[in-house]
Amino acid sequence: QKKKRNQPRTPNSDAEVIALSPKTLMATNRFICEVCNKGFQREQNLQLHRRGHNLPWKLKQKSTKEVKRKVYLCPEPSCVHHDPSRALGDLTGIKKHYYRKHGEKKWKCDKCSKRYAVQSDWKAHSKTCGTKEYRCDCGTLFSRRDSFITHRAFCDALAQESARHPTSLTSLPSHHFPYGQNTNNSNNNASSMILGLSHMGAPQNLDHQPGDVLRLGSGGGGGGAASRSSSDLIAANASGYFMQEQNPSFHDQQDHHHHHQQGFLAGNNNIKQSPMSFQQNLMQFSHDNHNSAPSNVFNLSFLSGNNGVTSATSNPNAAAAAAVSSGNLMISNHYDGENAVGGGGEGSTGLFPNNLMSSADRISSGSVPSLFSSSMQSPNSAPHMSATALLQKAAQMGSTSSNNNNGSNTNNNNNASSILRSFGSGIYGENESNLQDLMNSFSNPGATGNVNGVDSPFGSYGGVNKGLSADKQSMTRDFLGVGQIVKSMSGSGGFQQQQQQQQQQQQQQQHGNSRERVGSSSDSADRSSMNVNTGGGPASTSPPYGIHHASF
Amino acid sequence: MVAMFQEDNGTSSVASSPLQVFSTMSLNRPTLLASSSPFHCLKDLKPEERGLYLIHLLLTCANHVASGSLQNANAALEQLSHLASPDGDTMQRIAAYFTEALANRILKSWPGLYKALNATQTRTNNVSEEIHVRRLFFEMFPILKVSYLLTNRAILEAMEGEKMVHVIDLDASEPAQWLALLQAFNSRPEGPPHLRITGVHHQKEVLEQMAHRLIEEAEKLDIPFQFNPVVSRLDCLNVEQLRVKTGEALAVSSVLQLHTFLASDDDLMRKNCALRFQNNPSGVDLQRVLMMSHGSAAEARENDMSNNNGYSPSGDSASSLPLPSSGRTDSFLNAIWGLSPKVMVVTEQDSDHNGSTLMERLLESLYTYAALFDCLETKVPRTSQDRIKVEKMLFGEEIKNIISCEGFERRERHEKLEKWSQRIDLAGFGNVPLSYYAMLQARRLLQGCGFDGYRIKEESGCAVICWQDRPLYSVSAWRCRK
């Protein structure tokens, strides 16, 4: 039976951890013959050598008993293998690791001038150097891997972009949901979209290694197709390509632009090297498909100020080709549109489609009750409530009936399920009039369109949403049916309800204040937490955690 | 209402087989109220009225199912079947699956019937169909995309500077995630690492397909890559099979998998005590109200401050319940801890579907699946066959599992992030807050790709993906505490 070379070794076994010094690891001939001063790497070899001098010698016998497994640490403190939990399983492994990662690269390939620290690596490379060729799908041959990768990045971007182009032009908002298409196709779209976005953090690293090539996940361009203006289209197209930049502060700029200047990117793509229109460039670009180097370099206006473009045309390797993720462009389009409505800002998470915006007239994300989601699909058709909204309404009605009929104040907190529960059980229970209520509300025309006229169990719902604008108040009030609450209040005045009413009134009357109130209280919370920190800072860090930190 | 059902009881008391009950029912149409709308008018209800009535019926039915009264449940089920429809509006669709699940559950109390009915029903376990549905879910919802993005980002950040990276995927069904990771690694400033991905899945075909796609991509990018397929159900997984080696940096990704470990037999005990409560529904009510009352006022105010899902039905009850110990989950997490991964990223459904009583689970899952079905409603036309597939084969099956199964069979035991955090923490992991960049990217993904209505909430370093205000899924990253 063939011996398995790479036996899996679980790192957490109780192996003996051995830390060798760099000197020991680097030593080539640790075992010296006292007669002729010849050095040997292994003691066994020295013993065999001693035989030749007629010196006493002894070969170690293979011990029959199970030896305790040893793992070896890398002596370099900054190395991940310096941590005992990440020690390497064999001595040769740790030696080679130390040479490769922390040693001098002494061995140089004559053909490609690549350098190696371990002789065997160099030997292995020399055997294949020049023989291995990299062939791109487009037919171009490369002898070196990095040139090939550089080329591939461009070549791929082109291929993906041209494949996507037709769909982009139709600018389907639901681009990522190609129901009619076959699975494979949509597969590619969806996955590459992720790719595109996963690169977005990457530019921060670009200043370190100019030789690096970021591959664009151009799928994001498809997402950009949701917008319809021609500039958007350009943006989406451009997103498929690489921008060249050698700007170390690129990261900062990008960061900055995340927050504030999203819009300005959208239409302002600047072509650095060509006077032609952007679209023409694109065309030409795709014609150049089969050459390894692109002839045009696109740049974004926000980069152009401090950007010396190197000649990427002749030598793609030398240039730092930076992929500006398509996500940026695409988002910028989005923000462009949204800023006018929501006030923009990175923090505004839930953006609502325009039909919502128009119907609900300046609703910021937090305050849109999900009842409105019903109108999303077809704003002009007859209003139909979403399932979530129906559940909420059911909960509200349940609470109404339980309040009115049971006379018991069923703890009107905003826990919808308890209310819904009472809705269910109330019917199951003694009250026939519950159902009467239910049916009455059916016939009540006010109840169909919105939740008007229903006692609200969500007393604090409005309060939950900080910073409602004045415009929205009327919406909220309608929604919660405050008038009804006041009416029902007079009937049964439990403490909870009073509280609820107060909350409602607060929400109505002091809406401008609510933000301040929240702000100041969080301020004080901050302060108190700071106090805690200064008071018990050192003591509070638990020792194991600290050690853990250090080890990584 | 009670009167109505009692009436039914009276008329159908002779009938013992469902068919007979059905026939008497259809002859003797129950009326909603003696005076107002008769049963045949149900079809003419406006969508909203119908929706409300469906909810009402579902709850009534669930009460009957919980108390084990077949005849009453049957009456409710019949009305439900009249109104619910898998290709109707959102509420009709949801109701259709809940109706089926409830019927399934009550039918299980007649094991003979249940088995006889399901005897010939060969489980059409079509692998390609399963993959297809999973793929549709991936496309129609941003959830997996966000999860993959955050997972990859967390892995990338944890693996900075690493040369030997081993990623274990506990649900190796989707190559897209790792294709993205390959590309991201390739663009690292320090160059790509030696990458090994171990995929765990119970179907060989899925792993083969994945291996093919990944190896192809790795070759294209010229990244040293190895795919290690482990054909096994996650519950039967032996940690040795993962072949973790010394010296490599380990990452573990679990997408919607951990909750299956919660399935256990301790339900037997809980079910017994649950039954006692179920026989006395007002008792449950009282208990619930009691549970809410303490701390609810304070928490309501807290919610004011933190804009924390104001109407979430689970927030209060979840925190006041002690964490039930789950031996299998703990031992699995411990085994993973033993491999000392640099990072473990967990995506879970952020709902409380692991309540001990049917009623709890029904209410919670109604809210969750209402939100999920609403998502589809805004995205996909009602006539779409793909939509119906996702609803039926994914959500419908989950609903059925949550509602009609108990014990080891009930695998869809979704729990809130809070509970997972406790569990994972207890197993010796410390939370790694998701980075600003990761969150930014995830938000952009939602904004940029037409996923309006979704939000990402940050909750103590973890991400919670919400539909409107309803939390649906959570993503959290962890590392070994020593």
UniProtKB/Swiss-Prot annotation, chain B:
GO cellular component annotations of the record: nucleus
Main localization, broad class: nucleus
InterPro entries tied to this protein: TF_GRAS
Record region (Leucine repeat II (LRII)): 209-241
Keywords linked to the UniProt accession: Nucleus, Transcription, Transcription regulation
Subcellular location(s) of the protein: Nucleus
GO biological processes: regulation of DNA-templated transcription; response to gibberellin
Polar residues bias: start-end ranges: 305-324
Record region (VHIID): 134-199
PROSITE patterns assigned: GRAS (PS50985)
Start and end residues of each stretch annotated as PFYRE: 250-401
Gene Ontology MF terms in the entry: DNA-binding transcription factor activity
Tissue specificity as recorded in UniProt: Expressed in seedlings, root epidermis, leaves, flowers and siliques.
Stretches the record annotates as Leucine repeat I (LRI): 52-115
Subunit details: Binds to zinc finger proteins MGP/IDD3, IDD4, IDD5, BIB/IDD9 and JKD/IDD10.
Function: Probable transcription factor involved in plant development.
Protein's UniProt name: Scarecrow-like protein 3
Species lineage: Eukaryota, Viridiplantae, Streptophyta, Embryophyta, Tracheophyta
